[in-house]
Curated annotation (Swiss-Prot):
It comes from Tityus stigmurus. Signal peptide: none annotated. Keywords: Amidation, Disulfide bond, Ion channel impairing toxin, Neurotoxin, Potassium channel impairing toxin, Secreted, Toxin, Voltage-gated potassium channel impairing toxin. The keyword Disulfide bond applies. This is Peptide 2412. GO terms for cellular component: extracellular region.
Length: 23
């Protein structure tokens, strides 16, 4: 899995299939 998703996504991120996706 992924940890602290959204830290580098301007606090807008989602963990999908073990990867952090920004939106």
């Amino acid at each position: 899995g992924c940890r602290q998703c959204g830290g580098g996504c301007n606090k807008h991120g989602k963990c999908i299939n073990g990867k952090c996706k920004c939106y």
